[in-house]
Amino acid sequence: MFASIWQTRAVGVLIGCLLDVVFGDPKRGHPVALFGRAAAKLEQITYRDGRVAGAVHVGLLVGAVGLLGAALQRLPGRCWPVAATATATWAALGGTSLARTGRQISDLLERDDVEAARRLLPSLCGRDPAQLGGPGLTRAALESVAENTADAQVVPLLWAASSGVPAVLGYRAINTLDSMIGYRSPRYLRFGWAAARLDDWANYVGARATAVLVVICAPVVGGSPRGAVRAWRRDAARHPSPNAGVVEAAFAGALDVRLGGPTRYHHELQIRPTLGDGRSPKVADLRRAVVLSRVVQAGAAVLAVMLVYRRRP
């Protein structure tokens, strides 16, 4: 039915994008949630306060997911490779749920329903919302929308397009493990080291591709491409994450807002450097960030298909 593996992959990636746009994440039985529960169970066996134990934990889980992806991709049938690629891409994407949550938080903040916004924030990021007021919730949500534009949208598409089902499932496993154990808390400082470093590697190229797309797409929301480039070049390296800083700085410059500052997690308070030199973000800026994030995802889908066809022999 399809002339080559490259056409199969391109069609599968596009169908996966469409599934995410139409359905978003399933409320029950999401593969990522199932993986997370399995990882938590395995941690009860593998946990030791050391880097080697953490590397073994990550290697077992990512290796198992990668092997599963390779097996799914090689099952016989003319349509199966397309279905496998589409399903894996859909499972790895989270753009629709990200946008929905960002909009819901902006709606709540616009109505001054701070308590409800606090309850919703943990579904978007790992911040501690208990001490955040409206401005703090707005900044936390905007920063999370920016960072997850890469993690939940652009990077999975690029892995799916470049290397197929094993790679996109492996990427999602790495990213999920980083969100579970990649913290500098007393428990995970050493055990989570491998997950955090592997996530840095897996996102390195994709985060910069995301920033480029932010620059290109900024005018859609009345943003500044020049401001995005300026903030990216000047501020990104000051962020503690080599990848999140790139994307957050580009968003800050594009939207002419100022991000960073005191950032409270459940296990620590971080004083992060300032990204961008604009105003403090308002609820309207959060709405613009959500729209920009969706436009960037569309651009990433186009980029992914171009990448597939560029790799054709």
UniProtKB/Swiss-Prot annotation:
Keyword Membrane: yes
Superkingdom in the source lineage: Bacteria
Purpose of the protein: Converts cobyric acid to cobinamide by the addition of aminopropanol on the F carboxylic group.
One MF annotation (Gene Ontology) recorded for this entry: ABC-type vitamin B12 transporter activity
Record pathway: Cofactor biosynthesis; adenosylcobalamin biosynthesis
Record-linked Pfam families: CobD_Cbib
UniProt keyword Cell membrane present: yes
GO biological-process terms attached to the record: cobalamin biosynthetic process
Residues annotated as transmembrane: 52-72, 79-99, 154-174, 204-224, 289-309
Main location: membrane
UniProt membrane topology term: Multi-pass membrane protein
InterPro entries in the cross-refs: Cobalamin_biosynth_CobD/CbiB
Family: Belongs to the CobD/CbiB family.
Localisation per UniProt entry: Cell membrane
Record key words, sorted: Cell membrane, Cobalamin biosynthesis, Membrane, Transmembrane, Transmembrane helix
GO cellular component: plasma membrane
Organism (species): Mycobacterium bovis (strain ATCC BAA-935 / AF2122/97)
Record-given protein name: Cobalamin biosynthesis protein CobD
